[in-house]
Amino acid sequence: SVLTFEHQEDAQRLGFDKVIMQAGGIGYGKADQALKDTPEKNDKIVILGGENYRIGMGGAAVSSADTGALSSGIELNAVQRSNPEMQKRAANAVRGMIESEENFIVSIHDHGAGGHLNCLSELVEDTGGHIDLDQLPVGDPTLSNKELIGNESQERMGLVIAEKHIDTLQKIADRERSPMYTVGNVTGDHRFVFESKSTGNKPMDFNLEDMFGSSPKTILEDKTIVRNYKSAAYDSSLIQTYLEAVLKLESVACKDWLTNKVDRCVGGKVAKQQCVGPLQLPLNNVGVMALDYSSQEGIATSIGHAPVAALIDPKAGSRTAITEALTNIIWAPLKDGLQSISLSANWMWPCKNEGEDARLYSAVEAISEFAIDLGINVPTGKDSLSMKQKYP
């Protein structure tokens, strides 16, 4: 969203200036493909996708830091880049396994913040694993061991597969032109090790219980700041002027802030997109993807956001955002009514500003209570807590 807002109240200026882009994907999975198996000793650890670069270092930690608080070098190395072509190749290789008569993938995990360290350790958290540093794909030869292990080059998937099925996966990966690397073994010793066979260098060797079982809880302390806002002054004779001003807000009368660029019909399953009519104005309240080319079933998505309301009252902002999303999605015929709906809660918040952690707690609490009252689940979400901006 390029929607910005500022408000002067007493000696404080409140508002939001940062440009936000929220992107997400929708889809469905078969129930028999949803449950992971437990890796067994001597199973192979495999990576599908691209090479390692100095990308996404610091991951979640940097994304939640104040903009301008860290050096430009750290922030630059934390930036994520994308390679959709590589993502598609890796996804097609996984899809090839899923659509086979029997899916031989034991367990699979994406590469998020923390890179190989996060992905591969979670694959073997019940068993243990040994990763050969020499087998990890390197796109930048200047990477240190820390950068090689922890970067967030995103177009990659980590998976575990039995050694006897490696050839099947390799054939599918070759067909889809997806790079594939066998980088380690499941050990069964409940340790997670990165080691170079050529040099003997071992930058990491941990007990799994030290990684997963004893993480200290983070305690955040903040104080509640009460802000009293003056009542809005208005003149009933200027209703036409007020109406025109409100309708000029992009978040009110136009869905332009979602996006109205590029072709969103690739694949032929887009039943309803943002743009509508001969002028392709982005006015639709809901987007709909068909599940296939012949049935009348699909997946509907909508969005709700209420940043101005949340500035005044975080609880009201949470409830308003959910309400907006629901009033947008009612134009799709939901098979099971509200029971058909799942929410993704996305928090864009200036944490570490005095009083903002307390406001965020209130907002999350309100989401939870409101969703429970409605009988709607919130299985996922995303936080971006670096919305605090330092101006020179």
Located regions from the model:
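Glycine/proline-enriched, intrinsically flexible loops and inter-domain linkers
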Residues: 1-392
